Swiss-Prot record:
Assembly behavior: Monomer.
Secretion signal, residue range per the UniProt entry: 1-25
UniProt record, GO biological process: lipoprotein localization to outer membrane; protein transport
Family per record: Belongs to the LolB family.
This protein's record includes keyword Transport: yes
Biased composition annotated in UniProt, kind: Polar residues: 143-160
Localization per Swiss-Prot or TrEMBL: Cell outer membrane
Species the sequence originates in: Shewanella baltica (strain OS223)
Protein name: Outer-membrane lipoprotein LolB
Pfam families (UniProt xref): LolB
Main location: membrane
HAMAP family per UniProt: LolB (MF_00233)
């Protein structure tokens, strides 16, 4: 059984178990106590953010759909995939120098999150570039193919590693005061990813009022 089929089976098993146990609601990650919701004019002002949405992965042999929860900051990332009933089936916690993946009841570690996820799941997902695309930004290895009337990217090619990633910004929305993508489609060879951002929240350090102790 390949890695994607194994993960699909894991998600289906968790969904079935959740239904049998009559679980409801969604599991949430523990809060980042050092960060608070903020409003920004431009998504580039947010050095940290959190999102909730849907992720779909498609290959010639299989398909996978899951809820995605992602908290991103300059020095760490916390990514979780869950079933529709909220049961966690995958967590990936990483810093610039370490990564920990928990999947199917097993733990895996590496010093690179993208390499770890590809080794265990078989997905070559551009984790280093996704935070830019999620906030509608263009990276140094990106070539914009088409922009909209407001100058926002509609389609770009990432040429860092062949074959290149083709990224389409299908729709945009206003979240936390800024314009961010609502739907993204990524394609590379026979791998296709679709990401829908249902909620995107900019995060920042809480303001200290005059007279308060730091």
């Amino acid at each position: 059984m390949n890695n994607l089929k194994r993960l699909t089976k894991t998600i289906f098993s968790c969904f079935t178990l959740s239904a049998l146990l009559l679980l409801a609601g969604c599991e949430t990650l523990p809060p980042m106590t050092d960060l608070s919701p903020i409003t920004v004019i431009d998504a580039r002002q947010a050095t940290a953010w959190e999102l909730q949405g849907k992720l779909a992965i498609k290959t010639p042999d299989d398909k996978l759909s899951a809820n995605i929860y992602w908290r991103h900051s300059e020095d760490r990332d916390e990514l979780t995939l869950t079933t529709m009933l909220g049961t966690t089936v995958l967590t990936l916690n990483s810093t610039p120098n370490s990564a920990h993946l928990h999947i199917d009841g097993k733990d895996f570690r590496d010093d690179n999150a993208q390499r770890l996820l590809e080794r265990v799941s078989g997905w070559s997902i551009p984790l280093a570039d996704l935070p830019l695309w999620i906030t509608g930004q263009v990276g140094p290895n990106d070539q914009v193919i088409e922009s909209d009337s407001q100058g926002k990217p509609k389609q770009l090619t990432n040429t860092q590693t062949p074959p290149p990633w083709q990224v389409a910004f299908l729709s945009w929305q206003s979240q936390s005061g800024a314009s961010v993508p609502h739907q993204l489609k990524l394609e590379r060879g026979d791998l296709q990813l679709k990401l829908q951002l249902n909620q995107w929240q900019a995060l920042g350090k809480p303001a200290i009022l005059v007279g308060e102790q730091p």
